[in-house]
UniProtKB/Swiss-Prot annotation:
The keyword Disulfide bond does not apply. HAMAP family: SHMT. SUPFAM superfamilies: PLP-dependent transferases (SSF53383). It comes from the Bacteria. It catalyses: (6R)-5,10-methylene-5,6,7,8-tetrahydrofolate + glycine + H2O = (6S)-5,6,7,8-tetrahydrofolate + L-serine. Homodimer. One of its GO terms (cellular component) is cytosol. GO terms for biological process: glycine biosynthetic process from serine; tetrahydrofolate interconversion. Keywords: Amino-acid biosynthesis, Cytoplasm, One-carbon metabolism, Pyridoxal phosphate, Transferase. The record marks H234 as: Plays an important role in substrate specificity. Catalyzes the reversible interconversion of serine and glycine with tetrahydrofolate (THF) serving as the one-carbon carrier. This reaction serves as the major source of one-carbon groups required for the biosynthesis of purines, thymidylate, methionine, and other important biomolecules. Also exhibits THF-independent aldolase activity toward beta-hydroxyamino acids, producing glycine and aldehydes, via a retro-aldol mechanism. This is Serine hydroxymethyltransferase.
């Protein structure tokens, strides 16, 4: 190795690439000084980030543990096996594949394993809280398959299981997807199982948003009821950004393994798999159950206070971490609301609501989630303060004095509940 090469690989980020180091520093400052209410985001532990930023980044490992196409895999084999065993223990599954790079990749692998192009699938309409990968026409799931979308009841804004059953009886899907990206109520997986059995369909649960709540036992588990379960490993699970597939029947295992590799991916990201293993280990600890209980209680407190302030919440409340505001109650679009809360350092996202008259680029809703701020230590009282800041900003959009007051209150909350307070990120040294 030349002196110049040795020197270059031993430089820290700040010395090697000050432009990227500075931008990472700015992002850390943003996370520390803003209230993160995007429902799909959370704050991973330092241990998770240390694993992901390790020398495992260097290792290629196509295949499965003990069945690799490359040498030198003895240590990544042990890491991946540990991740698999922890995932199985955490969710009570018979089998797990920890290699999917994302939840979308996990869903695609399931489709590849169980379906043929042109088969019929059923999934929750995106505008009613579903996900792009559940049959949206802009996603491969909507291009390859005949999609029948179910929705929520117009009055209750909850899933109508009898209406879903009638759709299934009419269309005889080969696969039914139950899962969501913006549905604030408990999913009845047993009822979906009964419908799937009645029409002879496979049942896929996408629990990406509620995986941490399921792991902690504060939301019913889909694993006993579904042929296959997919999830991301971040969101409420608080791990690295990645995917996971679980199932209860070993007969399906080989199909799903092959659908991941070589069917839809090449080499796994072993540094991310190590970070997943760390996150699964954290979720197996008693403290994670307490955390998840607080996530749900905090969401209820947030929803109740916003309703009391005159802002409608879809379905009238929440059973999980998601609070979806229907801003038609205050004559505002989601796009405008997103901008208003952003300028007081609250991060959320505009979102469609059921039967939304606005386009997906405008929307009538604002989606909030409690996982990230609960990680920072926010309790129900703090979330009521957050709700008041949001309400004050949305109900007084033209008042500069209110805007400045909201900024000061957000700053005080951030100082009261610091993020990564012990030290700056070591990667920047």
């Amino acid at each position: 190795m030349s002196d110049s090469t040795a020197s270059s690989i031993n430089k820290g980020l700040a010395a090697a690439d000050p432009a990227i180091a500075a931008l990472i520093e700015k992002e850390q400052q943003r996370q520390e000084t803003h209230l993160e209410l995007i429902a799909s985001e959370n704050f991973a532990s330092r241990a998770v980030m240390d694993a992901q930023g390790s020398v495992l980044t260097n290792k290629y490992a196509e295949g499965l543990p003990s069945k690799r196409y490359y040498g030198g895999c003895e240590h990544v084999d042990a890491i991946e096996e540990l991740a698999i065993e922890r995932a199985k223990e955490l969710f009570g599954a018979a089998w797990a594949n920890v290699q999917p790079h994302s939840g979308a990749q996990a869903n695609f692998a399931v489709f590849l394993a169980l379906l043929q192009p042109g088969d019929t699938i059923m999934g929750l309409d995106l505008s009613h809280g579903g996900h792009l990968t559940h049959g949206s026409p802009v996603n491969v799931s909507g291009k390859w398959f005949n999609v029948v979308q179910y929705g929520v009841d117009r009055e209750t804004q909850r899933l109508d299981m009898e209406a879903i059953r009638q759709l299934a009886l009419e269309h005889k899907p080969k696969l039914i997807v139950c899962g969501f990206s913006a549905y604030p109520r408990t999913i009845d997986f047993a009822a979906f199982r009964a419908i799937a059995d009645e029409v002879g369909a496979f049942l896929l649960a996408d629990m990406a948003h509620i995986a941490g709540l399921v792991a902690a036992g504060v939301h019913p588990s889909p694993v006993p009821h579904c042929d296959v379960v997919t999830t991301t490993t971040h969101k409420t699970l608080r791990g690295p950004r990645g995917g996971l597939i679980l199932c209860r029947d070993a007969d399906f295992a080989k199909k799903f393994d092959k659908a991941v590799f070589p069917g839809s991916q090449g080499g796994p990201l072993e540094h991310v798999i190590a970070a997943k293993a760390v996150a699964f280990g954290e979720a197996l600890q008693p403290a994670f159950k307490t955390y998840s209980q607080h996530v749900v209680a905090n969401a209820a407190a947030l929803a109740e206070r916003l309703i009391a302030r005159g802002i409608d919440v879809v379905s009238g409340g929440t059973d999980n971490h998601v609070v979806l505001l229907d801003l038609r109650s205050v004559g505002m679009t989601g796009k405008v609301a997103d901008l208003l809360v952003s300028d007081v350092h609250i991060t959320a996202n505009k979102n469609t609501v059921p039967f939304d008259p606005e386009s997906p680029f405008v929307t009538s809703g604002l989606r909030l989630g409690t996982a990230a701020l609960t990680t920072r230590g926010f309790d129900a009282g703090a979330f009521r303060e957050v709700a008041d800041v949001i309400a004050d900003r949305l109900l007084n959009p033209e008042d500069d004095a209110v805007q400045q007051q909201c900024l000061r209150r957000v700053e005080a909350l951030c100082q009261r509940f610091p993020l990564y307070a012990a030290a700056r990120q070591p990667a920047l040294a």
